[in-house]
Design a protein with these regions (language model features):
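N-terminal secretory signal peptides that target proteins for export/translocation
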Residues: 1-5
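Bacterial N-terminal signal peptides
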Residues: 7-18
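Transmembrane beta-barrel domains of Gram-negative outer membranes and organellar outer membranes
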Residues: 23-177, 181-184, 194-239, 246-252, ...
Length: 274
C-alpha cells in the first residue's frame, strides 16, 4: 500500500505541472486501456486529421479544420498511467460566418487561421485488481492555455477534468465508459468558470491484428444552464479500425452530432507499444 501511495503522490505531482494546452474545439479522447491491460509499459502515437463543417466559436466562423501533429504518449508504473498528448498545429479555413466574432478576435488575412494546441497531461489510476471482472479507473488532468485569443480558434483559459471509468471484457468484445466533470475557464468576466459533463463510451472487437471500434464522446452543458461562448456542448461518433499490435495503424471516420462539432472528418495515426 505504501508503494501505491508513492505512485499516487507522484501522479498527482506530475498532473499539476504546467503543460501547454488550449480549449474546446475537440472533446477529450477516451482512455486507452492497453497499458493497464498489460500490453506494455510505454505507448506513443502520432497522426493528423481533416474535419469539415467545424465551427470556431470565438471567431464566429465555420469551415475546414486540419490537425497536423496529433500525438499522445503514455507511461505505466504499477497501477498508474501518466498521459500526455495534443496537437502541434491547427489550420482552419474560414468558409462562412454564423455569428459576429468576439471583440478581441482579429480578422483573418487570407481566409486561414492557425494556432498551436491543444496539449494536455493526465493521470489514470486503476482502482481494481487485475482479475476483477469489471476494471475501474480514476482519471484526472489539466489542459492549460497556449492559444491566442486574437486568432479565435480557442480561448486562452485553463481547464481541468476528472472522470471515473470502467471496462468489461468478454472474449473478443470489450466495452468501456467514463464520465465526470470538466471545470473550464471562460471568456465571460461575469461567469469565469463553467462546469460541464465529460463522457466517453467505446466498444471494440479484438480479432487479433485487426481491432474495429466505435466510440461516442463529448461534453455536455447541464440542463437549464445556457451555453457560454467557447464552452459549447460537443459530441462525436468515431468508427475506427486499428491494425497491428506492437506497431499499429489507426484510422477513424468522425461524425459530429452537436452544432459545434464537425460534420464529417477523418483521423489517421501510427503508433507503437513497448
Amino acid at each position: 500500500m505504501a508503494k501505491v501511495g508513492r505512485y499516487l503522490a507522484l501522479a498527482i505531482f506530475l498532473c499539476l505541472i504546467p503543460h501547454s494546452t488550449s480549449a474546446q474545439l475537440r472533446p477529450l479522447d477516451a482512455f486507452d486501456w492497453r497499458l493497464l491491460d498489460g500490453e506494455g509499459v510505454v505507448m506513443g502515437e502520432v497522426g493528423g486529421g481533416w474535419l469539415s463543417d467545424q465551427r470556431a466559436s470565438l471567431a464566429g466562423t465555420e469551415g475546414t479544420l486540419w490537425e497536423a501533429g496529433n500525438f499522445r504518449a503514455a507511461w505505466r508504473t504499477g497501477r498508474v498511467v501518466i498521459e500526455a498528448g495534443g496537437t502541434v498545429q491547427r489550420i482552419f479555413r474560414d468558409e462562412r460566418a454564423f455569428a459576429a466574432p468576439e471583440p478581441e478576435v482579429a480578422p483573418d488575412a487570407d481566409g486561414r487561421r492557425h494556432d498551436a494546441g491543444d496539449y494536455r497531461i493526465a493521470t489514470a489510476v486503476r482502482l481494481t485488481g487485475e482479475r476483477a471482472p469489471v476494471a475501474a479507473v480514476l482519471r484526472f488532468g489539466a489542459r492549460l492555455p497556449t492559444t491566442d485569443n486574437r486568432v479565435g480558434l480557442d480561448r486562452d483559459a485553463t481547464d481541468f477534468f476528472a472522470t471515473i471509468g470502467g471496462r468489461a471484457r468478454r472474449g473478443s468484445v470489450a466495452v468501456q465508459a467514463e464520465a465526470g466533470v470538466g471545470i473550464f475557464g471562460t471568456r465571460d468576466p461575469d461567469f469565469e468558470q463553467d462546469d460541464l459533463l465529460v463522457y466517453a463510451v467505446k466498444a471494440e472487437y479484438d480479432v487479433g491484428l485487426v481491432v474495429p471500434a466505435i466510440t461516442v464522446l463529448g461534453q455536455q452543458v447541464g440542463a437549464g444552464h445556457h451555453e457560454i461562448r467557447g464552452n459549447e456542448s460537443l459530441g462525436e461518433v468515431r468508427a475506427g479500425l486499428r491494425i497491428g499490435r506492437r506497431e499499429y495503424l489507426r484510422a477513424e471516420v468522425v461524425r459530429g452530432y452537436t452544432d459545434f462539432s464537425p460534420g464529417w472528418g477523418v483521423l489517421v495515426s501510427a503508433g507503437a507499444v513497448r
